[in-house]
Structures are given as C-alpha cells and as structure tokens.
C-alpha cells in the first residue's frame, strides 16, 4: 500500500470549541497550526528525539519553545508530579496563550493534560500519541486526570485543540504493549458496526506499516469523536464507549494492575459480548466476528487462572454503579448499542460461570 497523505478532520464540540484530528506520515508538521505564539513540550523519557524534532518544526514557523520536560508511566498520575510540572511551566514563563504539546501514552496524556487544563484556568493542548492505546482511543475525547485513592479520581474534561498521529512514533512502541491498543480499536468496530477498516488493514497495522496504522487510528479516533461531540461531558450517549470496561476494570484492579489495560479490555469485551447475547439478543455469529478480531490481534479472551473470582467481587465498586445495578452498554447487534441497567450480581455470576471462581 502506498503511503497515504495526512488525513484531517475537524470535530465541533461547542460554539467555541473544536478538536482537529490528523493522522498520517508527516502529521507532526501540522503542529504549528495550533500554536499560540509560544509552546511547552511534555514528552515520554524515551522520546527526546521526537520532542527535539517537534521543537525544530515549531521554531521553523516562528513559535518560541519555552521548555520541555520528560516523564511517563503511571507514576506521573499523581498530584505531586502535576505540581512539579506546574512549577516548571511557570518557571519557563508560560502564558495563557501558550500551547502545551504532549508526546506520550495514555498516562502522560492524562496527567499533563490535567496540568494544562488547570494552570491559569486552562492552556490549550495538542496530543501526540506514542502508543496504540493512545492512538486508537486515549488521545481524543478530553478526559484528563490523576489518581487519588483510585484511578482518575481527580480530573477534568479538556479537549485538545489537535490530535496528531505520526505513525512512525506509534510504530516505535516496544513489543510489550503494542497490541494492547487494538482492543480499543475492536471495541469501536463493535459499537459502530463498521468492520471494513479493521478487516482489511488489521494485519498490516499489526506489522507496524505506517499508512495502515495511520488509517486505522484516524478511523478509530474519528468514531470516538463523533460520539464525544454528541455528549462531551459523558452524561448519556458517550457511556457506550465503556463497552468492555466494566469487566475489564474489575480484572485490572484484581490483578493489582499487572494485567494491562488493553488486555483487560479485550477479556472484558469477551465477557460483555456474552452478556449482550444473553440480555440483548446479540447474534452469536456477530459476537464471534468480534472475538476473531481480538484473536487476530493476539489479545486474550479469558483471564489468567484464579483472577476471575476476585475480579467478580470488585464489580460492585464500579463508578458506573447506581444502587444495585451498573449502567453499562450492551449490543443488540454490531452497531446497535444500548445502555442497560444490569444487576451487579448478574455480571459477577457471569464472570464466575465463564472463567471459574478461583
């Protein structure tokens, strides 16, 4: 497949707020479009070369880069780290017009996005994902946050001005974790009912070919942003994006986060597809199509031995719980999700039935 040009789409979120999603080889060159005169760069520790490249692109267009700082991993999702970042940005001389460019995975996008959204009552951001999980999902949608007695308990909705998917940066992700993001891609396939992009491009994207990887990221982020544009603050429709996450989050927590988010969501999708078959009438063949995509991506469909029983006991702690039920998305058909109140006990029993009580 020939290298595709940079694809670009604008998503209007409100009268005065929009997010531009751009993906393709050369997407980084779009960065100056979002600059407000000065810039500050936050990047993963392993991406210093990419940060320097971004700085050269910005400076060549007359944008002053005030400074850069490295960080990454779940440790950045703390108020201590955010306080340090606030201090560094203030020392560098950021102003209300400064744009913060964030090159990294989901944890860094969350934490640095939160820092930018609160400093001076909100600085503009540009997200540049470095992982498949971020490129297919986390880089768009505007959720920021840090951990406090639980994951993402302190945060804001702060949509980036741009999301730039430079496939060479994403393709450089280490093998461990590269496949994880494909769980979120497959989730979007199930919710949208549009199987074509993944069916034709999945093997090439798994092989890290830049053009197919960028095309899938553009499609996946585009689907998510269509949903987000209709419900920016997650009061209704946007909650369909939690498909796979009720069971997935319980498994992640039960493993003390040794089971990655992407793998947890993959297993969660398998469980919630079965729940959709039983409670919403999802045809078996359509469920199997989704499971086949997860398997093609090399993702698990069941948890490690002994984990399901402990995870089943954690389902009731889900933030989506209302009384004795959880408001969660189920699929009537691929492309036809609905929000349903499912008793906590129903979800817990299903997990034990499918995977054992440990």
Curated annotation (Swiss-Prot):
Record's GO cellular component terms: cytoplasm
Alphabetized CDD domains for the sequence: DHQS (cd08195)
Pfam families documented for this protein: DHQ_synthase, DHQS_C
Entry binding sites for Zn(2+): 184, 245, 261
Pathway: Metabolic intermediate biosynthesis; chorismate biosynthesis; chorismate from D-erythrose 4-phosphate and phosphoenolpyruvate: step 2/7
Single biological process term from Gene Ontology: aromatic amino acid family biosynthetic process
Binding-site positions, NAD(+): 72-77, 106-110, 130-131, 143, 151
Localization per Swiss-Prot or TrEMBL: Cytoplasm
Record EC number: 4.2.3.4
Predominant subcellular localization, coarse grouping: cytoplasm
Cofactor annotation: NAD(+); Co(2+); Zn(2+)
Cofactor-binding details, from the entry: Binds 1 divalent metal cation per subunit. Can use either Co(2+) or Zn(2+).
Function: Catalyzes the conversion of 3-deoxy-D-arabino-heptulosonate 7-phosphate (DAHP) to dehydroquinate (DHQ).
Sequence similarity: Belongs to the sugar phosphate cyclases superfamily. Dehydroquinate synthase family.
One Gene Ontology molecular-function label: metal ion binding
Protein name: 3-dehydroquinate synthase
InterPro entries: Dehydroquinate_synthase, DHQ_synth_AroB, DHQ_synth_fam, DHQS/DOIS_N, DHQS_C
Keyword set, alphabetical order: Amino-acid biosynthesis, Aromatic amino acid biosynthesis, Cobalt, Cytoplasm, Lyase, Metal-binding, NAD, Nucleotide-binding, Zinc
């Amino acid at each position: 497949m020939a290298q595709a040009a940079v694809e670009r789409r604008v998503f209007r979120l409100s009268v005065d707020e929009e997010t531009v999603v751009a993906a393709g080889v050369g997407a980084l060159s779009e960065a100056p479009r979002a600059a407000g005169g000065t810039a500050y760069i936050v990047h993963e520790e392993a991406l210093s070369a990419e940060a320097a490249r971004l700085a050269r692109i910005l400076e060549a267009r007359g944008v002053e880069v005030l400074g850069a700082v490295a960080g990454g991993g779940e440790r950045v999702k703390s108020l201590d780290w955010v306080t340090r970042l606030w201090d560094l940005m203030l020392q560098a001389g950021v102003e209300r017009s400064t744009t913060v460019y964030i090159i990294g995975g989901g944890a860094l996008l969350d934490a640095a996005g939160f820092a930018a959204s609160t400093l001076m009552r909100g600085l503009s951001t540009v997200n540049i994902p470095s992982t498949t999980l971020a490129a297919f999902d986390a880089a768009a949608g505007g959720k920021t946050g840090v951990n406090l007695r639980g994951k993402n308990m302190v945060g804001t909705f702060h949509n980036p001005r741009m999301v730039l998917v430079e496939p060479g940066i994403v393709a450089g992700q280490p093998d461990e974790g590269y496949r994880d993001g494909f769980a979120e891609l497959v989730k979007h396939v199930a919710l949208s009912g549009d199987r074509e992009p993944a069916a034709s491009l999945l093997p090439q994207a798994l092989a890290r070919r830049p053009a197919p990887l960028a095309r899938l990221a553009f499609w996946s982020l585009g689907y998510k942003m269509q949903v987000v544009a209709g419900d920016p603050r997650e009061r209704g429709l946007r909650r369909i994006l939690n498909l796979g996450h009720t069971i997935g989050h319980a498994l992640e927590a039960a493993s003390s986060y040794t089971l990655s988010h992407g793998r947890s969501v993959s297993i969660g999708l398998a469980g919630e597809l079965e729940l959709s078959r039983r409670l919403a009438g999802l045809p078996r063949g359509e469920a199997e199509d989704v499971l086949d995509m997860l398997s093609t991506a090399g993702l698990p469909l069941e948890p490690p031995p002994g984990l399901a029983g402990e995870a089943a006991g954690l389902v009731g702690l889900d933030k989506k719980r209302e009384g004795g039920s959880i408001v969660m998305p189920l699929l009537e058909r691929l492309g036809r999700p609905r929000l349903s109140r499912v008793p906590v006990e129903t979800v817990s029993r299903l997990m034990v039935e499918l995977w054992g009580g440990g």
